[in-house]
From Swiss-Prot:
Zn(2+) 1 binds at C12, C17, C31, H71. Keywords: Immunity, Innate immunity, Metal-binding, Plant defense, Repeat, Zinc. Interacts with HSP90-1, HSP90-2, SGT1A and SGT1B. Forms a ternary complex with SGT1A and barley HSP90. It comes from Arabidopsis thaliana. The 2 cysteine and histidine-rich (CHORD) domains bind each 2 zinc ions, and the plant-specific 20 amino acid cysteine and histidine-containing motif (CCCH motif), located between the two CHORDs, binds 1 zinc ion. InterPro entries: CHORD_dom, RAR1. GO terms for biological process: defense response to bacterium; defense response to fungus; plant-type hypersensitive response; protein stabilization; respiratory burst involved in defense response. One of its GO terms (molecular function) is Hsp90 protein binding. Transmembrane segments: none annotated. This is Cysteine and histidine-rich domain-containing protein RAR1. The gene is RAR1.
């Protein structure tokens, strides 16, 4: 008996989903996705559709989608985000600033003044920590070791290795089961890439399609050390 195309497993191409589905099992609301692409600026990663953000790339990819609909194999067309350049505040010359500070009653009395950036010396001294205080702040109690959760070998899990995201069972896991990126993602000068394989592209969808460079075990923990 020939299996129809309706039962063929397909991968959803919506941003933030990537789930496997079939044409005969694709109800409205089964797909949770991001309606528009990401925005990267000053080390911050943000979804432009819902303004959810994170500094950590792995946590950023785990932010759930803000819209629901049907799965699709059509890749979304992403609008290129234009970074917002901060406008520098006007600065006054040192001579002019000194003149205004002399005429300002708050500055002359030693109070903090946001207009002229002065700060009383006593307040500065209080913010400085002595060497003994700094050492005390560094001493923290040791946290108890994290206990690994006991998982059924037949229980489906989602691999958290970067670049993988596949569903697996522990009974089928082995040393070459997972294709992933061991190194961190790198975002610099509007380029996106992986440090482990030194591949960099400009567009986010091209970045997500960079093939993994390493084989290994699937891991359901976002932290390889756990």
């Amino acid at each position: 008996m020939e299996v129809g195309s309706a039962t063929k497993k397909l991968q959803c191409q919506r941003i933030g989903c990537n789930a496997m589905f079939t044409d005969d099992d694709n109800p409205q609301g089964s797909c949770q996705f991001h309606a528009s692409g990401p925005f990267f600026h000053d080390g911050m990663k943000e979804w432009s559709c819902c303004k959810q953000r994170s500094h950590d790339f792995s946590l950023f990819l785990e932010i759930p989608g803000c819209k629901t609909g049907k799965h699709t194999t059509e890749k979304p067309v992403l609008a290129k985000s234009v970074p917002k350049h901060p406008v520098a505040a006007p600065t006054s010359s040192p001579d002019a600033n000194a003149a205004t500070k002399d005429s300002c009653s708050r500055c002359r009395q030693g109070f903090f003044c946001s207009d002229h950036g002065s700060q009383p010396k006593e307040q500065i001294k209080q913010t400085l920590n002595t060497p003994g205080q700094a050492e005390e702040e560094k001493i923290e109690p040791l946290a108890p070791p994290v206990q690994k959760a006991v998982i059924d070998i037949n229980q489906p899990q989602v691999c958290k290795n970067k670049g993988c995201g596949q569903t697996f069972k522990e009974r089928d896991n082995h040393e070459t089961a997972c294709s992933h990126h061991p190194g961190p993602a790198v975002f610099h000068d509007r380029l996106r890439g992986w440090k482990c394989c030194d591949v960099h592209v400009k567009e986010f969808d091209e970045f997500m399609e960079i093939p993994p460079c390493t084989k290994g075990w699937h891991s359901s923990s976002p932290d390889p050390a756990v």
